[in-house]
Amino acid sequence: MLETVVIVFHLLGALGVVALVLLQQGKGADAGASFGAGASNTVFGGQGTSTFLSKFTAILAACFFITSLGLGYFAKEKAQQLTQVGLPDPAVLEVKQKPAADDVPVLEGQKPAAVPADVPQAPEKK
């Protein structure tokens, strides 16, 4: 239940940040005025909407980061619950190695290696 509430706030925060960034005026551009930002300078004071929108964007971005951390915590808790359900812990599992093949065919005229090695030996010259 709490995870669903955090997801809803996370999505609302993400959409809000996107909308506020698109509404803000860029340097030397009046794109925000087409959405009403230019006409509402008197509502938000003498400085206009730039400080209001930038502060509100910063607040929404901080909320977005906090909900991201919360969702990460919920994901970690859910992963820990899944390992406790009955699945074996991968760190505890033993890896069984196959026994060395003793029935490898040997060519006539060659003698088998005395000690098995990882690096192949060069044939002896007669």
Swiss-Prot record:
The chain crosses the membrane at residues 2-22, 55-75. Residues 112-126 have a biased composition (Low complexity). GO terms for molecular function: protein-transporting ATPase activity. It is a multi-pass membrane protein. GO terms for cellular component: plasma membrane. The keyword Transport applies. InterPro entries: SecG (IPR004692). Its main location: membrane. It holds the Pfam family SecG. It comes from the Bacteria. Keywords: Cell inner membrane, Cell membrane, Membrane, Protein transport, Translocation, Transmembrane, Transmembrane helix, Transport. It is found in: Cell inner membrane. GO terms for biological process: intracellular protein transmembrane transport; protein secretion; protein transport by the Sec complex. The keyword Cell inner membrane applies. Residues 103-126 are annotated as: Disordered. Belongs to the SecG family. NCBIfam families: secG. This is Protein-export membrane protein SecG. The lineage of its organism: Bacteria, Pseudomonadati, Pseudomonadota, Gammaproteobacteria, Pseudomonadales. The gene is secG.
